[in-house]
Amino acid sequence: MSQQVIIFDTTLRDGEQALQASLSVKEKLQIALALERMGVDIMEVGFPVSSPGDFESVRTIAQQVKNSRVCALARCVDKDIDVAAEALRIAEAFRIHVFLATSTLHIESKLKRSFDDVLAMAVHSVKRARNYTDDVEFSCEDAGRTPIDNLCRVVEAAITAGATTINIPDTVGYTTPYQFGGIITDLYERVPNIDKAIISVHCHDDLGMSVANSITAVQAGARQVEGTINGLGERAGNCSLEEVIMAIKVRHEMLGVHTNINHQEIYRTSQLVSKICNMPIPGNKAIVGSNAFAHSSGIHQDGVLKNRENYEIMTPESIGLKEVQLNLTSRSGRAAVKHRMEEMGYQDKDYNLDSLYDAFLKLADKKGQVFDYDLEALAFINKQQEEPEYYRLDYFSVQSGSSVMATASVKLVCGEEIKSEAATGNGPVDAVYQAINRITDYPIELVKYQLSAKGQGKDALGQVDIVVDHKGRRFHGVGLATDIVESSAKALVHVLNNIWRAHQVEKEKQRLQQNNQEMV
């Protein structure tokens, strides 16, 4: 029977340290409840002595969260421990996590103490924390650079004092998997009372090895892994919990352990953390990145369509995503194009695959990714691989300031005529969008707005990528200009042209259907 690896989440403590602005109590509670749904065993939610705001956050979460154990951090200082206990006492059960540097470098240059002093401080603090709870974790800060003899001594002393979890952090991400696994093995072999506590690991990603170090530690006997959602954390970040969790699930036959995580909540939790923390997830991020389950190569797409296991070691559904994503690009094959048309409900008799694929390749070479509405337009109304511009931005002006509501005037070329409108909004971009929407009158909802810089200095361009929802369907648009408001307006106009084209497709399909009925 496999053993459980306890998942200890520190997104709201160690992860928050990476953010430019502190999270509100409400935002922290949102994340805590999401972590609870996901099934984390322990959540470290703050450092109560650090500020009144952190104290209030810890107390609020301790009151609201019922199915995960709430934990707070404290230095090996009496006041820290007492304040942590006060913040947590409203919870039915809680953990106090005390930490103290143990490496020679930290002891001499930071603490300016002797190792014997550190040993005594660790024992005293663990005992003090045990006065409040029987769940006490002790962390040997910078354990990765602590001499193994000293590490064994402090671990043994902390367990004797009452620590039920011993955490071995690679605080600066210095160790390699072979080295870190060796540290855990040495502890099991040399600490006589090691069986009285759970060994935990907390790895940072400075050399990009936090997940590998954590998995190696599990193989060596560690039974708790600490980390954050999306790898949030200081410097290069923490061990990415979703990666460790899925590695344990996917490689269960090798690791022989399991977690109690609800895997289908992983993606939703990741997206929530990204949104609240304003930390975008890189597209190539393992498990939760937008490309993690995307296939662009024609060979890969064909292989996935024949058997998903050809190129997928886990399913998107296993983390809460709905389906495989086949990105249609110039590298896509005929099978992928045909599959996408079938998914949209078209049969072979509805279009000519040869001519569609030829037109698709030419369009993909020009624009990169081709979307569903592009395919339909190529199949039914536009064989020239050009995106027709029914709408074109002719002119816009904006007035805004700190004490006035933003107002925009817009002129839009609509086919053969020019229409103009004015509107107010919550900022200049919103005002321009409101004015354009008054002209076109399409029911749309902005789903995504992303601004990125192209180039540097005064010649830099602002690229705006947006996604809107129109009658349950997603449409994409891109705008590029030196002025952010202008690039935003161009992106929306691009979207509107895509929507207009989709409407033309529907009209053409209706016309063809009517002609077929008349022929019958």
UniProtKB/Swiss-Prot annotation:
Compartments where found: Cytoplasm
PROSITE patterns: AIPM_HOMOCIT_SYNTH_1, AIPM_HOMOCIT_SYNTH_2, PYR_CT
UniProt binding sites for Mn(2+): D14, H202, H204, N238
Tagged with keyword tRNA processing: no
GO molecular function, one term: acetyl-CoA C-acetyltransferase activity
Top-level EC class as recorded in UniProt: transferase
Pathway(s) of this molecule: Amino-acid biosynthesis; L-leucine biosynthesis; L-leucine from 3-methyl-2-oxobutanoate: step 1/4
GO CC annotation, single: cytosol
The keyword Transmembrane is annotated on this UniProt entry: no
Reactions catalysed: 3-methyl-2-oxobutanoate + acetyl-CoA + H2O = (2S)-2-isopropylmalate + CoA + H(+)
Cofactor list: Mn(2+)
InterPro entries referenced in this protein's UniProt entry, alphabetically: 2-IPM_HCS-like, 2-isopropylmalate_synth_dimer, AIPM/Hcit_synth_CS, Aldolase_TIM, LeuA/HCS_post-cat, LeuA_allosteric_dom_sf, LeuA_bact_synth, PYR_CT
Subunit note: Homodimer.
Family named by the database record: Belongs to the alpha-IPM synthase/homocitrate synthase family. LeuA type 1 subfamily.
UniProt-recorded name of the protein: 2-isopropylmalate synthase
Taxonomic source organism: Yersinia pestis
Gene: leuA
